[in-house]
Every structure is written in structure tokens, then in C-alpha cells.
Amino acid sequence: MSMQDPIADMLTRIRNGQAANHVSVKMPSAKLKVAIAKLLKDEGFITEYAVADEAKPELEITLKYFQGKPVVETIQRVSRPGLRIYKGKDELPKVMGGLGIAIVSTSQGLMTDRAARQNGTGGEVICYVA
């Protein structure tokens, strides 16, 4: 069976893994998923990520907890295959008043909403993480 939205699947696996207090979650790997995992690690939402080089590459994300509670409170897909959401540099959202991040796909690559504002670029809003 083919997957219609692999990014939504990735976010759902992270959400479900943290709800069940799993140490890590595994999923099929892709360049965009690895870029999202890198941003989540840089922003402190996950502990680590690794790509296993096999016949079918697999991405493993080590989840992060603080005092027994998941660090990621909400993780939500915004732009989806059926309805793409694009925002200009002045329209980029601030998630939870700046406490969370919006992951934006720009012409300069994947970055957070803060980095996109600093670079003066807009793009496709992939997801919100708080």
C-alpha cells in the first residue's frame, strides 16, 4: 500500500510514540524527513536521529522527555498534499507566541519560522511543533 502523505505519517509516529512513552520510533527514511529530524534536534524537541543504511533506509528518532513528560506537546501538519499552505516573510506564524516553531520549506531549504524571518524568505509551512 502506498503512503499518501509521508510527512504526516512521520509526525503521527512521533506523536504516538511519545503518547506511549516509547524511547524511539522508526520509519522509512527520505531526505525531507531527515531534514525535519535535524531541525527538531537542533531546536531541542528530540534527543537524536539516525539513518540506517540498508536495502530500504530507515530513520530512527530518539524521543525526548523532561521529568517523565514528552517535550513535544503538539506536533501538527499544516500544508498537506491536498491543500498547500504558503506564507510570505511577513505572514509567517508565531507558534504559541514564539515558544514553538513552524517548519518552513523555502527556496534556501528547510528552516524554522525564525530563521526564515531573519533571511527575509517565505515558503510552504510544513508543520507546527510546540
Curated annotation (Swiss-Prot):
GO terms for cellular component: ribonucleoprotein complex; ribosome. The keyword Phosphoprotein does not apply. The keyword Disulfide bond does not apply. Keywords: Ribonucleoprotein, Ribosomal protein, RNA-binding, rRNA-binding. Coiled coil: none annotated. GO terms for biological process: translation. Signal peptide: none annotated. GO terms for molecular function: rRNA binding; structural constituent of ribosome. Belongs to the universal ribosomal protein uS8 family. One of the primary rRNA binding proteins, it binds directly to 16S rRNA central domain where it helps coordinate assembly of the platform of the 30S subunit. NCBIfam families: PRK00136.1 (NF001109). Part of the 30S ribosomal subunit. Contacts proteins S5 and S12. This is Small ribosomal subunit protein uS8.
